[in-house]
Design a protein with these regions (language model features):
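Active-site-adjacent bridging/hinge elements
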Residues: 7-9, 79-85, 194-200
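C-terminal subdomain of alpha/beta-hydrolase-fold enzymes, centered on the catalytic histidine
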Residues: 87-200
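Flexible loop/turn segments at secondary-structure boundaries
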Residues: 1, 30-33, 55-59, 105, ...
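Conserved structured core elements
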Residues: 3-7, 23, 27, 31, ...
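Beta-sheet entry/capping signal
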Residues: 10-11, 20-24, 31, 44-49, ...
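Alpha/beta-hydrolase active-site loop
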Residues: 1-16
Length: 200
């Protein structure tokens, strides 16, 4: 899962590339990995920058505003849970079907890019050219990596899901956050985020 990936990347930076200190930036899974770099490896990882909140405080929302955000977030996520549940519980079954079907991989990826993008008039080509769409699809087809890309969901579930450990201590390294217009998931109130990160 992403916590193990963070451990591997930290070792690579320190032992293979000989950096004593580094910063990490990530979105989506990269944000989750950056969170774990900041949490587990702050002796080496000196700052992180993320554009989505993928991890949750173990104590959950505390204020009325935070609780309202959580209710809205949970409601919004219902429409996204199908693919995540499949990949977090049965990634290999899905992978066998996809690796045998380029059209299946294309449909899976295009549906996500369509649903997660700020489209004009519901037209995916208002944001992505056919070349960009095909390049994304072909990366998975030509490298046979739909399978391995799916397993990170399973790994995160095995590592405890979206929540930091119950004995969580705030990530004290400087944290930068980018919030773009029309994000798929709305950020929680700043009070919630500041219980997790040292925002700069």
């Amino acid at each position: 899962g992403p916590r193990k990936i963070a451990e591997i990347l930290n070792k690579m930076m320190i032992k293979n590339l000989n950096y004593k200190e580094y910063c990490a930036q990530g979105g989506d899974w990269g944000a989750t990995i950056a969170n774990w770099l900041g949490y587990d490896h702050s002796n080496n990882c000196k700052a992180i920058h993320i554009n989505c909140l993928t991890m949750r405080h173990p104590e959950g929302p505390q204020t009325k505003e935070e609780k309202e955000w959580q209710i809205k977030f949970d409601k919004d996520q219902i429409m996204q849970d199908g693919y995540r549940t499949q990949q977090a519980t049965k990634p290999q079954t899905l992978s066998y079907a996809m690796l045998d079907s380029p059209v299946g991989i294309a449909a899976w990826i295009i549906e996500k890019m369509h649903g997660w993008s700020d489209l004009k008039d519901n037209n995916i080509e208002s944001v992505y050219s056919k070349d960009v769409l095909l390049a994304n699809i072909m990366i998975y087809i030509l490298t046979n990596t739909f399978n391995t890309a799916s397993w990170i969901y399973f790994g995160r579930r095995e590592e405890g899901g979206r929540f930091f450990p119950k004995d969580f201590k705030k990530i004290n390294i400087p944290t930068g956050i980018a919030i773009f217009p029309n994000e798929m998931s709305e950020w929680p109130p700043r009070s919630y985020v500041e219980r997790i990160f040292n925002i700069k």
